Amino acid sequence: LSPYLDLCHRLGAFARQAAKGSVESIKISYFGGLVDFDCVPLTRAVQKGWLSGVVGDEGVNDVNAPFKIKDFGIKVETVKSADSVDYNELIEVCTVSSDGDQRSVRGSLLGRANDPRIVEVDGQAIEVRPVDTLLVVKNVDKPGIVGKLGTMLGDFSVNIANMSLSRADKGEWA
């Protein structure tokens, strides 16, 4: 399970940043080969990742993460699912905010090197390394959006090292 600890930490941090409003619950689902393992360390890594941006890395550890997240009034649910997925192992972190807003992020390890990847955000398939700085943009799929975004970032000397695009259907949300 150790290769998944960093991925889980990053999924927790991403889920916190993507959530809107006050989060009431976090659901962590494990798919594929992970259902055969004790996933408590992975759940704690998600919680630690969630909290690290709030209380700092020094204020949270694997032991106190479940207690601290409860102190924030957040209910945590874990599920192991035998449902078929596109990956041998997959982890999904879903949040529900007090206003009913729901967000989800899925991650897996790819290849022999066990490279961590975010493979889905809010139902949109992507493939991106969960590095320290990510920009997630939701827009209507139409010509010129990517170019305008690239120009705007370039005007502020922001270098785009990697990009992942996804859409449900032409002209829909991307």
What does each model-identified segment do?
Residues 1-174:
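A conserved regulatory-domain signal marking ACT and ACT-like small-molecule sensing domains
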